[in-house]
C-alpha cells in the first residue's frame, strides 16, 4: 500500500496493492475557489509553488492555475515564483510583494511557506483586511491563524485520517483475497472560517480546540 504515489518501476496489482490519495487536482481547484472568495473574485494575485518535480504538488498547482483561468476571469495572476525549500516562504513572498505591490492575494503552497508569506506581508505593512493568503495542508498553525482572522483566509485540505482508514481497509481486503482498486481517491475539503469547526472535526475526528473556537467568536 502507498499513500499518494508509488515507487517508480513498481506495478499495481503485482508489486503493491493500491495507492490511496487525495484528489490533488481538485485540491488545487479548491485553493483557487478559496482565494476568489477571499478577495471577492477580482484583483491581482500571485502564486508560490513548489519548484521540485513532485507529482502531488504538481497536480495541485495545475488545478489551481486551471481553475483560475476557467472560472475567475476577473482575477489576474500577475506573478508566480517557485521555491525548493518551505522555509524560504518569507523570502519568496517578500520579493513578490516588493515587485507587485498591488497584489491582494497569494497562493502560498502549504502551511510552512504560507506562514512565511504571512510574516512577509506583515513586514510589508499589509493587513489581513487587504491581503489574503490561501494554502493546502491543514495543520494547527494555519488553522489557528484562520480562526483568529489572520492572513490565512482559506485552506484546501487532504483528509489524512480517512486516507489512513481507506489504506487499512484496502490492505485488509487484499489479505483475504478480496478485489481492491489499484487507485483509491479521498476527496479534499475546502476550509474557511465559516466551516472551520465542522472541517476540523472531519479532518481530525476530534472537536475544534477551545482557543480556536473562542477566536472564531471574536
Can you describe what each PLM-predicted range is?
Residues 64, 78, 82-145:
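Hydrophobic alpha-helical
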Residues 19-45, 88-90, 137-143, 159-176:
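Hydrophobic alpha-helical segments within soluble ligand-binding/sensing domains
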Residues 1-26, 44, 139-148, 152:
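Flexible loop/hinge segments that line or gate small-molecule binding clefts
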Amino acid at each position: 500500500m502507498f499513500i499518494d504515489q508509488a515507487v517508480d518501476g513498481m506495478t499495481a496489482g503485482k508489486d503493491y496493492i493500491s495507492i490511496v490519495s487525495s484528489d490533488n487536482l481538485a485540491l488545487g481547484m479548491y485553493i483557487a475557489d478559496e482565494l476568489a472568495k477571499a478577495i471577492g473574485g477580482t484583483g491581482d494575485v500571485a502564486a508560490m509553488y513548489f519548484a521540485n518535480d513532485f507529482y502531488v504538488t504538481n497536480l495541485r498547482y495545475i488545478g489551481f492555475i486551471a481553475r483560475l483561468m476557467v472560472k475567475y476571469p476577473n482575477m489576474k495572476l500577475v506573478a508566480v515564483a517557485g521555491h525548493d525549500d518551505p522555509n524560504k516562504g518569507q523570502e519568496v513572498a517578500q520579493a513578490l510583494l516588493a515587485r507587485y505591490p498591488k497584489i491582494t492575494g497569494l497562493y502560498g503552497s502549504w502551511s510552512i511557506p504560507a506562514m512565511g508569506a504571512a510574516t512577509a506581508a506583515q513586514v510589508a505593512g499589509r493587513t489581513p483586511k487587504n491581503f489574503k493568503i490561501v494554502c493546502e495542508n491543514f495543520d494547527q498553525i494555519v488553522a489557528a491563524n484562520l480562526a483568529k482572522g489572520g492572513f490565512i483566509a482559506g485552506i484546501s485540505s487532504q483528509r489524512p485520517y480517512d486516507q489512513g482508514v481507506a489504506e487499512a481497509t484496502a490492505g485488509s481486503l487484499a489479505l483475504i483475497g478480496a478485489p481492491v482498486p489499484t487507485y483509491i481517491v479521498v476527496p479534499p475539503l475546502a476550509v474557511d472560517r465559516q466551516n472551520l469547526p465542522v472541517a476540523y472535526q472531519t479532518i481530525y475526528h476530534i472537536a475544534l480546540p477551545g482557543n480556536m473556537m473562542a477566536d472564531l467568536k471574536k
